Every structure is written in structure tokens, then in C-alpha cells.
Design a protein with these regions (language model features):
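Short beta-strand-centered aromatic/proline hotspots
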Residues: 19-27
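Short coil-to-beta transition motif at edge beta-strands of beta-rich domains
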Residues: 1-16
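Charged, low-complexity terminal tails
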Residues: 5, 38-39
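SH3/SH3-like beta-barrel fold
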Residues: 32-37
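Residue-level signal for tight coil/turn positions that link beta-strands
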Residues: 28-29, 46
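Intrinsically disordered, low-complexity N-terminal extensions of nucleic-acid-metabolism proteins
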Residues: 4, 21, 53-55
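Intrinsically disordered, low-complexity, charged/polar segments
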Residues: 40-59
């Protein structure tokens, strides 16, 4: 389970980088709902995928 993530964080799915950057909408137990820029809303099981946190520049 990934404890360093919280709603509002931006992530990428290393198993599906074509999905683009996504913003975490919710975390419930081992399920993370992410709204990805290229593929829309996805529910990720963190037992199967380790999401990579990315930093978004506000400039």
C-alpha cells in the first residue's frame, strides 16, 4: 500500500504512461481513484500498481 499519496496529488501509472498525468480524487483502502488527462477516471488497485508521484510546477 502507498502511504505517501493523498487526494490532490499528481501521479503517473508506470504500467500505462500513455494515460498521462493524473490527479488523485480519492483513496479508500487499497483503491485509488485517479482522473488521468488522456484516459479519464480510473480506479487503481495499489496491490497491482505502484503509482509514481510527480511534482507539477505552478509557474
Amino acid at each position: 500500500m502507498q502511504f505517501d499519496l493523498e487526494p490532490g496529488d499528481f501521479v503517473i501509472n508506470p504500467k500505462n504512461k500513455e494515460g498521462g498525468t493524473g490527479q488523485i480524487q480519492s483513496i479508500i483502502k487499497n483503491k485509488i481513484t485517479v482522473n488521468f488527462q488522456n484516459i479519464g477516471k480510473q480506479v487503481i488497485d495499489v496491490n497491482n500498481v505502484v503509482l509514481e508521484k510527480v511534482k507539477i510546477n505552478d509557474n
